[in-house]
């Protein structure tokens, strides 16, 4: 555990030195506080026989969308250092596991090894840490963070259609959509907000007139359908 924590602290302090915002004394004080805090945190969550166990607990994560890592925040407070002065990347993840320390810059880059203590690899730890710092710096400038990726990848303009008779022409879509403010607002109505419905209109019809016989009409008995008998004669 001692070697893994030392490699982690050296890696972070080398990144801080590249930022050139803190004095040598402040960097050394921050490194000492960070080492002490990591020892206190990892001593009950270190499993050499199963390195992946407790990996999430030992992970050091920096992300603008999440709260600041508790260990880094406390190390800054106890060393009287502003976290922003460290110059660490906006997104970075460090896995401190038995026999190996890995890092990833951003969310889209591949992880890389900071230091490995498996067999003879431990003898090359200082060189590997230095190479990891250089690789991390290059990945930081070339990688894309999760909050910087464009959310809309659709084309902004509609491509032209070669067929002149096609209804899908670019000119049909260039007119601006009218704003809703150009239309009159809906009137408010009383009585629970519902407007009075007008009564249906039906055209007036002429009243039916019953047929009346005129005075000149014969009132006598009918001989047949074509002849009437006048009884007054």
Curated annotation (Swiss-Prot):
Any single Gene Ontology cellular-component annotation: nucleus
Sequence segments annotated as region (Disordered): 135-165
Pfam (any one): BTG
Coiled coil: none
Gene3D superfamilies in the record: Anti-proliferative protein, N-terminal domain
Tree of life domain: Eukaryota
Family from the record: Belongs to the BTG family.
Protein name: Maternal B9.15 protein
Source species of the chain: Xenopus laevis
């Amino acid at each position: 555990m001692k070697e893994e924590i030392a490699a982690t602290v050296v890696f972070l302090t080398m990144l801080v030195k590249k930022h050139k915002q803190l004095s040598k004394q402040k960097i050394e004080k921050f490194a000492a506080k960070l080492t002490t805090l990591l020892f206190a945190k990892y001593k009950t969550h270190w499993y050499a026989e199963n390195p992946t166990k407790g990996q999430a607990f030992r992970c050091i994560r920096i992300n603008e969308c999440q709260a600041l890592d508790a260990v880094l925040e406390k190390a800054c407070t106890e060393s009287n250092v502003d976290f922003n002065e460290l110059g660490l990347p906006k997104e970075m993840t460090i896995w401190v596991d038995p026999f190996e320390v890995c890092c990833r810059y951003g969310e889209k880059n591949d992880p890389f090894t900071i230091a490995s203590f498996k067999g003879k690899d431990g003898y090359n730890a200082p060189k590997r840490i230095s190479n990891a710092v250089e690789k991390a710096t290059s990945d930081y400038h070339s990688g894309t963070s999760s909050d910087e990726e464009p959310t809309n990848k659709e084309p902004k303009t509609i491509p032209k259609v070669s067929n002149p008779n096609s209804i899908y022409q670019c000119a049909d879509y260039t007119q601006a959509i009218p704003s809703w403010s150009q239309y009159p607002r809906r009137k408010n109505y009383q009585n629970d907000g519902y407007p009075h419905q007008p009564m249906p209109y039906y055209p007036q019809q002429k009243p039916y007139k019953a047929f009346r016989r005129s005075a000149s009409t014969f009132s006598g008995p009918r001989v047949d359908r074509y002849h009437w008998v006048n009884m007054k004669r």
